[in-house]
């Protein structure tokens, strides 16, 4: 068998902590890093996940010069690549096209942290995310064989409030109203991420759809609820996994009371994906519309590629309209809007309300009061009076069901 030299050389990197910025929080070593620990020269894959995940931006990726070439087998062909680059980089050197929107390339790898496993390939017979797994001498990589998908999921819990896609009447009840779990990995890099320990988690155990469905069904029995929600991170990134998970969950919960709730940013929910979700059993969905304007969207989400950001933003808005037009009775839809004066203006909030009203004045709209978190610890959580004002603005557009999350609990649809 001949050895092939792949194309453009991609030098390996190693992570290095900037001790002047580092606060010793341990997140990079204990949660984000998929190898031993950040900066461990022998095992560092140079993937950059720790750098993306550090709340203090204290990790730099340093290029390593004069890397040694090694041999790996890719789909039966022996190829030569630099050691300690990720499999994703090796695949890119061999002609694969990584992308962050489905169909823009042939290697969908949106999270870059090893959280979503959309890019997983067989490595020596074991499924591994190629974005954080380093090549090693003699490694056998199989990108062709179809296998049962896996994805890291955690945090099964009872939820007393629910999410954007939870009907507002249930939010008034006491006790748990649904059970939820959280997938790791996200295609956004929100500096104020409200759930960043899931978004940047690279160490959680990956589960098959059936394993996750069993745990969710057990959680339903534990908390004695009928609603089962999956959130994140961003739960829709690994499409094959999510569809199989919903099908497995529906098989294990065949009663009429069971509700299957998907909580999402909607950024890749094309019509064919939505159709597949409905067919798989989805009964409720909450879609977070981050903004109306592109500049606001990039500011909130950290997606700086404007072409990609435009696709994400338009896809989410289109998903809302598609569900309203095609499944007004079959699928309960809730729309989420973020609010913090440092992130989005009241004028844009009103324009979002106007646009949602033209789609459906009766759709449930839930405004989320973004609190200080992750890299935007300096922002202030909106005051109660601010959220009352937001409620009045949105209700004034003609929307009939506006709910606002506040430090004192939810307000609306009437106050």
Place the predicted regions along the sequence by residue.
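Short, structured interface segments
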Residues: 44-64, 137-153
């Amino acid at each position: 068998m001949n050895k092939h030299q792949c194309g453009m050389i991609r030098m390996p990197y190693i992570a290095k902590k900037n001790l002047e910025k580092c606060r010793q929080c341990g997140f990079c070593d204990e949660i984000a890093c998929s190898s031993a620990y950040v900066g461990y020269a022998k095992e560092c894959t140079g993937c950059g996940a720790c750098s993306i995940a550090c709340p203090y931006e204290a990790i730099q990726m340093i290029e390593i010069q004069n890397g040694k070439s090694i041999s790996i087998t890719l789909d039966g062909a022996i190829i030569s690549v630099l050691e300690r680059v990720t499999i994703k980089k090796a695949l890119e050197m061999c002609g694969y096209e990584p992308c962050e929107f489905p169909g823009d390339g042939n290697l969908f790898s949106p999270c870059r942290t090893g959280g979503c496993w959309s890019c997983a390939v067989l490595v020596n017979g074991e499924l591994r995310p190629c974005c954080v797994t380093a090549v090693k001498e003699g490694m056998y990589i199989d990108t062709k064989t179809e296998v049962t998908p896996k994805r890291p999921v955690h945090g099964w819990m009872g939820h007393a409030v629910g999410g954007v896609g939870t009907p507002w009447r249930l939010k008034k009840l006491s006790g748990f109203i649904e059970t939820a779990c959280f997938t790791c990995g996200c295609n956004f890099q929100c500096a104020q991420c409200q759930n960043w320990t899931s978004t940047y988690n690279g160490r959680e155990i990956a589960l098959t759809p059936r394993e996750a469905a069993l745990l969710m069904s057990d959680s339903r029995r534990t908390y004695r609820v009928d609603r089962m929600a999956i959130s994140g991170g961003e739960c829709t990134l690994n499409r094959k996994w999510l569809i199989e998970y919903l099908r497995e969950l529906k098989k294990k919960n065949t009663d009429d009371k069971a509700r299957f709730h998907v909580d999402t940013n909607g950024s890749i929910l094309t019509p064919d994906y939505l159709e597949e979700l409905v067919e798989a059993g989805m009964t409720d969905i909450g879609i977070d519309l981050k903004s109306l304007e592109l500049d606001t969207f990039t500011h909130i989400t950290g997606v700086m590629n404007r072409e990609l950001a435009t696709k994400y933003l338009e896809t989410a808005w289109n998903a809302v309209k598609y569900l309203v037009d095609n499944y007004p009775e079959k699928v309960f839809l809730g729309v989420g809007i973020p609010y913090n004066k440092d992130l989005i203006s009241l004028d844009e909030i009103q324009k979002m309300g106007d646009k949602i009203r033209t789609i459906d004045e009766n759709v449930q709209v839930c405004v989320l009061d973004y609190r200080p978190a992750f890299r935007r610890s300096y922002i202030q959580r909106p005051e109660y009076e601010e959220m009352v004002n937001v409620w009045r603005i949105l209700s004034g557009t003609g929307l009939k069901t506006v709910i606002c999350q506040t430090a004192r609990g939810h307000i609306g649809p009437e106050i």
